[in-house]
From Swiss-Prot:
Its main location: membrane. It comes from the Eukaryota. Residues 1-21 form the signal peptide. Glycans are attached at residue 84. Residues 155-217 are cytoplasmic. The chain crosses the membrane at residues 134-154. The keyword Disulfide bond does not apply. Keywords: Glycoprotein, Meiosis, Membrane, Signal, Transmembrane, Transmembrane helix. GO terms for cellular component: fungal-type vacuole; Golgi apparatus; membrane. The keyword Aminoacyl-tRNA synthetase does not apply. This is Meiotic expression up-regulated protein 29. Residues 22-133 are extracellular. It is found in: Membrane.
Length: 217
């Protein structure tokens, strides 16, 4: 009698366990096919798209397959592909959320799982749909500021070296040139007066009689 009861308990335990695992796991379903929101029959949409390209391009078909069969059925990792994806968009990130993991048929799975994905423009898509985003004011502004700084530094260096004091040039500085000419005239006048003074002193020295001492006396 004990053996019969034990066998019955084991039978019910295995049957209920298998039924529970079959009903609330996704390892029996290898792939999920997501269609557009227009063909949806349940309360919420199956496809949730985020990103700037969703308004112009929406993917009507997505096939997702989990890549670890019969391993951790409640924590499946899904790999999704979009066969009808345009070359102007690319999927950046995606994830699958299943509210009810009833694995009795493919239809029940597709009605209860939701695919969230983010759609971004590729280079060709931006060039076709958003060409103004390829041009930014930041590089031009930075280049303009660097050009102004380089021009200021070059002008300061040229002024320190005295290259901008030459007359009849487009960088002619009248004030600096006048000061330079005044200093040159002053220096030449001083040199002329100094030479005249030396010459006058020499002439006076020649005219003054010098007493001669006679040592024989």
């Amino acid at each position: 009698m004990f053996v019969v009861k034990t066998a019955v308990l084991l039978f019910f335990a295995l049957f209920i366990g298998n039924t529970y695992a079959y009903t609330y796991s996704l390892d029996r379903i290898q792939a999920l096919k997501f269609s557009s929101e227009s063909s949806n029959v349940d309360d919420g949409p199956r496809l949730h798209c985020k990103g700037p390209a969703c308004s112009s391009h929406s993917n009507d078909l997505a096939i997702c397959q989990h890549n670890q069969l019969n391993v951790a059925p409640h924590l499946l990792k899904w790999t999704c592909v979009w066969p009808n994806q345009s070359s102007h968009v690319e999927v950046i990130d995606y994830n699958i959320e299943c509210k009810k993991t009833v694995a009795l048929s493919m239809d029940s799975i597709t009605k209860t799982c939701i695919l969230n994905y983010k759609l971004e423009w590729t280079y060709s898509g931006v060039l076709l749909h958003r060409p103004w985003k390829l041009f930014s004011l930041k590089p031009f502004t930075a280049a303009f500021v660097l050009l102004l700084a380089a021009s200021y530094l070059a002008t300061a260096c040229f002024r320190m070296l005295g290259y901008l004091g030459t007359p009849r040039s487009r960088f002619h500085d009248n004030r600096r040139w006048n000061e330079q000419k005044f200093m040159e005239l002053a220096v030449s006048a001083v040199e002329e007066q100094l030479s005249n003074g030396i010459q006058l002193f020499s002439n006076v020295k020649q005219r003054v009689p010098v007493p001669v001492l006679d040592e024989s006396v």
